Amino acid sequence: AWVRAAQMQSATLEELVQLQHANETARHRVVGLVIETRPDAVTPDALTLIRQLGATKIQMGIQSLDQQILDSNDRGIRIERIQRAFELLRAFGFKIHAHAMVNLLGATPESDKCDYRSLVTEAPYQPDEIKLYPCALIEGARLCRDFDSGAWIPYTEDALMDVLAADVLATPSFCRISRMIRDFSSNDIKAGNKKPNLRQMVEQR
């Protein structure tokens, strides 16, 4: 069944081009296609192919622009590579949807505010959309040992709300915040925010 499903969802580039042309005059058209990737996978060759596939927007997990925080959380990427990814995406004409995370290991409320402000206001970043997540600890994650040792402590609800409210206010009008929590069951979250209406709470603050 899986093989048959995969075959039904496969096509050659030639077949794709034919469908793209048909889409141009279709009554109900596909007007946007989003692909998610890592900043270090963004290259001219990759973007050329992604553009051929018809994508119009790229999502990337940035999480932080603080090199020390990236290293502490084993992100395995340099700030310079993230900058290059943004520059390439702009050059290729893609909309950019970045993911940012507060309360990572090594972060503080003030460093989070500064970090986010840099992401949304400074060149070469300034994404078109943002997913703004508070770090939530899931059982089995490497962060569990840092939580158990006291090296990582989740923000209090008041501190988290303060950070997120500041981030919302720092977001330029051209940038849309599309999401503010991850889709995890509260039963799976060992530590961190469990409020499903967190964004509503922040916006009412």
Residue ranges and their predicted role:
Residues 1-97, 101-158, 162:
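Conserved non-cysteine loop/helix-boundary elements of the Radical SAM core domain that shape
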